[in-house]
Amino acid sequence: MATLFTDEELAAIRAAVAKAERRTRGEIVPMVVPVSARYRDASYLAGLILALVTLAVLVSLDSGWSQWRWTAHHSAWMIVGVLMAYALGSFIGRFPAMIRLLTSDERMAMKVRLRAERAFYEHGLHKTTEGTGILIFLSLLERRAQILADQAIDARVPPGTWDTLVRDLVDGIRADRRTDAFCDVIARCGDLLAMHFPPRDGENPNELPDELIRGT
């Protein structure tokens, strides 16, 4: 997480936010987190699957399986083997690839949405003077993004606008264009804000920080 963006890339994202906000009274906050939830159920499920597979293999053995010719019918050894398999599976189930494999798309989408909503309030996007805050939220493990806009700007953009921006951001991240993708989406959010909330009488206070927020 700490090395995902270099200092130069962080500076580029900060500059993109500052440039976009110079044309509007709105506020744009980019944020990235390593994961949006703990997904303990994926670890439990991986352990259960490996334990059941191990149990099936042990039960099916009809010949000795150690140098002392213990058989799978010796329950004590069978229990030890199953427990070890469960522990190993639970450990493997903590890896990002396994979490993605064992967790439904719907569940991951819900978790990312909830984490983004929490961040929206934690970082004060709901407190802008005119209700013009936009959160650009990226969750790395799930490879998903969310764009949440406060009510004033959200009411003025066509349906599907945020979904399009989210799709373009995720596509850019997957194509290893993370900085360019972030900066492009920031600029396009700036265009939307500038269209509906341009600076007024030279007043354009910067209500929220421009830096990329790196969550945990």
Where are these predicted regions, by residue range?
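Alpha-helical transmembrane cores and adjacent cytosolic helix/loop segments
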Residues: 2, 6, 36-43, 63-70, ...
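Short, charged cytosolic
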Residues: 4-28
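Soluble periplasmic/extracytoplasmic beta-strand elements of cell-envelope proteins
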Residues: 27-32, 133-139, 146-148
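Select subsegments of transmembrane alpha-helices in polytopic membrane proteins
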Residues: 40-52
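Transmembrane alpha-helices and immediately adjacent membrane-cytoplasm interface residues
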Residues: 59-101
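Membrane-cytosol interface motif
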Residues: 104-123
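Flexible, solvent-exposed short loops/turns enriched in glycine
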Residues: 126, 141-177
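Cytosol-/stroma-facing membrane-proximal "stalk/adaptor" domains immediately downstream
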Residues: 164-216
